[in-house]
Every structure is written in C-alpha cells, then in structure tokens.
Design a protein with these regions (language model features):
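Glycine-rich beta-alpha junction loops
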Residues: 53, 185-187, 232-236, 240-245, ...
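Nucleotide/pyrophosphate-binding catalytic subdomain
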Residues: 1-226, 318, 394-395, 410, ...
Length: 415
C-alpha cells in the first residue's frame, strides 16, 4: 500500500478511530467530540476516523433487500458508504459546538485509492494531502471509515471492519505517533470476558499473536487492520471508547528474556462443518472441491482428509456458519461432478484456540491442551496448528467449558 508520507512533527499526531457503537446516537457523538477536544487540550493533533452510527449499515442493507432483488454491487457501495458520510458531518458539527474547528472527508477526499472489487475493496495507495493540510491549519480532520474511490473513479466500500483499516492506513500515510482503535471493550483479553470472569486484559501483545486471535474468532480489531499494521510497523492501542484507562498495545514481538508461553484462549461458536463422503482418491479432486469455494469467497478453515479405503476417502472442512448455505450448495455440485457419495453438514460444532508466541519453543503445549480437554470429557473432532496456535473443533455445547478449563490450565488469570 504505497503512500505519500509526511515528515515527523514536534507535536504528537494521534489517529483515533471510533466504531458504530461509540457514535450510535447524538449523546455518544458529543462524548466522542469531547474526547477529541481533551486529547487536543493535552497538546496533540488528532485525525478522527468514524464508522456509521450504531446499526445504520445493517439498516441500509435491509432497506436494499426490501427495494431490490438484484442489488448491483456498485450501487450497494454508494448506499452503504452513505452511513459514514452522515456520521462525519454530524461529528464535525459536534466539534464546532465545542469550539474545535474540524473538516469532514470522505474516503475519496482523504486520498484512498482502491481496486474495483465492490463490497470488499482493497486499498492500493493513499495520498492524504488534504488531511495533512487540515492538520497543518490546526483543525481536526474527520475521515469516513471503510471507503475509498476505485481506479475507475467509483465509490468503494472496504467491507466490514474497514474503518479499523482506514485508521491504520492513515497512521502510516501521515507518519502518526499512535493509532488508537476505540471499541466497546477496554482492550485485548486473555479470553472473552463474557465467557470467563477471570479473563485478564493484556498490557501488550504481538502483531502475530493478535493476527492468530482474530483469525480464529476474536472479533476486534478487524484482522485486515492488524495485517496492515504489521506490514507497515504501525503501533496500535486498542482501548475502550467509554473510559480513559489504558488498553492493550499491539507491536512487534518484544525482545524479552522469557516470553509468556500462552497469551490467550479464543472461543468461537460461529463455525460449521461440511463433510464430503466417498470421494474418489484421485489427483485433482481436492482442487475440484475447493477452487469453486475460493471463487465464491467462502472462507474455508480446517481441512481433514481421512485415510483412503478401497480407493475412496472422506474430506471434512470448517467454514463460518453464515456461509454454510452457499458452501453446501457449491460442494454438492462439486461432489456430483467428481462422483462422490454425498455431502453432510453439522452446525453444532465450535472451536477453541490456544495462542501464544512462546508455544514454538515449548513442545508440551499441545499435550496439555489435549489432556485438559480429555479430563473434562470434551471430545476433539478436528485439530489445526500454526507455529503459535493450536485450534480444536469441539461440540458447540462444550466451547464455554473448554475455554474455562484451558484458561485455568495455562494460568492466564495470573499474568
């Protein structure tokens, strides 16, 4: 993502991103404006990135479904990005009422050039010159999240979670001193606080660890934004939109003498499983199954192929539950073409993942996971690993218990 970057300045420049929950109504918009004012009063320049208010994006999507059966992608991007344009205008009005001069910018005005992939556009370059001019004039730049303009001069939507990516890209392009992602939680925790009362907020975590966490179910920040931050060395501060307490810093792996073996346990109940039975054990059959899924942007995660028996095998994979219907349709067609026996689905599964940078140098982690789950009578259906993660598919009804016992086994409540 090439960009035109500005030189370092003596006054700190902070990028602050607030999501839809944080700007859901007029009172919260004024609270965010007050937060920005206080940040400036402490001697900082601020660029503010905001999402659409509350559930406005969902409401616009429902409205489109009521109006149209075809819903052309170009027009959907025009519609969806209207939510952010509304939010930035209202935010500037609130700031002006507090004697803070501010200018609003759409993604296009802020210099975001994207590809032509409507609904999920990728940033190609950023030239935030107009934003920089506003900063230099002593004003606050308020930028619409999750949008840009394509190479063929059409408005584009960056997809869900794109406001985080907008903020990180601006932090890189403007050479900002910090990029603060404000959410409805106070940082990154050792597990979901709604599941485990003993969940502990992490003071810091590495990009690699957070990427693994977001890939297996941690909802915030958006995975794309962490990827961009890691690629361009943008240090992140994930913190609460409703308090001034410090959150979690995300940076390159710290060069400490002894790193924690495990940083987090991540529960995920949004997964389903598809099994293709009686698959001919021939070259090319796996590609015939998974290429059509990739072409339709179906997000396949774990894949297991059984040992061949009499020239046939079974292949199982997991995918998000929201993509189960389209995934099943695609796989059923592929199964018929390759002569497989049939397709079955299971939406009663879940996943629990253990993540930690110290895992690579501690070979006993996997054994501890398996023993802990076995002692609780929790059956493991599938396993996948990376250098710093082990994920297990279990029954959805066992996800909470698995999370609690693994969090306890690795003593994550003790810090």
């Amino acid at each position: 993502m090439p960009s035109i970057r500005v030189a370092f300045r003596p006054v700190s420049l902070i990028i602050q991103k607030f999501g839809g929950t944080s700007v859901a109504d007029p009172d919260r918009i004024r609270e965010v404006a007050d937060h920005v004012k206080r940040t400036r009063d402490h001697g900082n320049d601020v660029v503010l990135v905001v999402s659409a208010m509350g559930k406005e994006t969902d409401q616009l999507l429902r409205l489109a479904e009521e109006v149209s059966e075809t819903r052309p992608a170009r027009e959907m991007d025009m519609l969806i990005t209207a939510g952010e344009r509304k939010a930035i205008a209202l935010m500037c009005m609130a700031l002006h009422d507090m004697d803070v001069q501010a200018d609003s910018f759409t993604g296009s005005q802020a210099g975001f050039l994207t590809d032509t992939n409507h609904q999920n556009a990728k940033i190609l370059t950023i030239n935030p010159q107009r934003v920089q001019e506003t900063i230099d004039a002593g004003r606050v730049a308020v930028v619409a999240g999750s949008q840009g303009v394509s190479t063929d001069n059409n408005v584009t939507f960056l997809g869900r979670g794109g406001s985080d990516t907008t903020a990180v890209a601006l932090a890189h392009g403007l050479n900002a001193d910090a990029c603060e992602l404000y959410t409805d939680v106070s940082g990154v925790f050792t597990t979901d606080p709604r599941v485990c009362d003993q969940a502990r907020k992490l003071a810091s975590i590495s990009f690699d660890e957070l990427l693994e966490m977001t890939a297996v179910g941690c909802p915030k920040p958006a995975m794309r934004s962490v990827e961009v931050a890691r690629s361009y060395g943008v240090r992140l501060h994930v913190r609460s939109a409703f308090t001034w307490e410090p959150g979690t810093w995300v940076d390159k792996e710290e060069n400490t003498m002894e790193k924690p073996i495990i940083s987090a346990v991540v529960p995920d109940t949004s997964q389903a499983k598809v099994t293709i039975s009686g698959v001919p054990d021939n070259p090319g059959v796996a590609a015939a199954i998974f290429r059509p899924l990739a072409d339709q942007n179906v997000n396949v995660d774990m894949i297991v192929q059984n040992t061949s028996d009499d020239g046939v095998t079974d292949i199982s994979f997991t995918l998000p539950t929201e993509q189960l219907a389209i995934g099943t349709e695609i796989v059923t067609n592929a199964a018929q073409e390759i002569g497989a026996a049939g397709v079955s689905t299971d939406d009663t599964i879940g996943r629990v993942s253990v993540v930690g940078a110290g895992m690579a140098s501690n070979p006993g982690v996997a054994a501890t996971i398996f023993e802990t789950l076995s002692n609780e009578g929790i059956n493991i259906g599938m396993i996948s690993t990376s250098a710093i993660r082990v994920s297990c598919v279990v029954a959805k009804s066992d996800v909470e218990k698995a999370t609690l016992v693994l969090h306890d086994a690795f003593e994550l409540d003790k810090g």
